[in-house]
């Protein structure tokens, strides 16, 4: 185990939540810009669903943040969870 507690492992949805706050963008606006359902976005924001590559690409368009950033966040999260579970 890496010494990380579960609470220290940050899901990409937390970062997305912060980005939305910083851009003063509502979830409803994100739904309109991405064409993704409110249910899916809420699930990502709550850390219940992982961020898919296709959603990352839609975020790139909607937020002007490269899809690679979101994919890398998800990959890092997945790796940390695996390490935590060892």
Task: Describe the role of every protein-language-model region.
Residues 21, 32, 43, 57, ...:
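Alpha-helical residues within the helix-turn-helix
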Residues 69-86:
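Short amphipathic recognition helices of helix-turn-helix/homeodomain-type DNA-binding modules
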Residues 18, 43, 72:
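DNA-binding alpha-helical recognition surfaces that contact promoter or target DNA
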Residues 48-62, 78:
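Short, basic-rich loop-to-helix N-cap that marks the start of a DNA-contacting helix
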Residues 25-43:
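Short alpha-helical DNA-recognition segment
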Residues 35, 46, 75:
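Residue-level detection of the helix-turn-helix DNA-binding "recognition helix"
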